[in-house]
Amino acid sequence: ENALKLASFQTNKKKVIAFKNGFHGRTSAAVAVTDNSKIIAPINAQQEIELFNLGDLQGVEAALKQQDVCAVIIECIQGVGGLDESKTSFYRGLHLLCKKYEVILIADEVQSGFGRTGDFFAFQKHKITPDIISMAKGMGNGFPVGGILIHSSIKASFGLLGTTFGGNHLACVAGLSVLNAIEEEHLMENVTEMSAYFVKIASTIPQ
């Protein structure tokens, strides 16, 4: 929610581009950019959203040319959607389009972040740099905590965004403990090794 709000503040626009089969949350703007009509209430219809198939750069650029888009939000691996992902060429192309049309690129790493892919964030595999990164879930290893990272080009101001339970000391300790465990227990290296093993074994299973 805060990632989308910040993108709107930064660009002074309100339309968002998202992708079919994606999931970004259950609050106002986040649920509006989620491709699931069952959880979108009529009150969310005020949001200006356009959904595209994952990989459709041509469609995205046609929409960006209208100059009314504040953000493109994407999961580099669609968690709830069934682990769908596109090719590196798509993510790099999307990144370039956002730069070309001065649109904020939001990487939703709530499900894929914190080492779950072998990289700290899933977008790193594609060598792109989002403007905003949203994170949660793995951030606290089960303890409720979330946040966003913003590019230095975005000038946030005190009080611009807020959260009722923000700055919780216990949540911060949980987050630090997770970072320590990832480093000390070499969890990302283990993910990389186990991934190669899994792919090797899975490839022997008949289609």
Each model region followed by its residue ranges:
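Conserved N-terminal phosphate-binding loop of PLP-dependent enzymes in the Aspartate aminotransferase
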Residues: 1-207
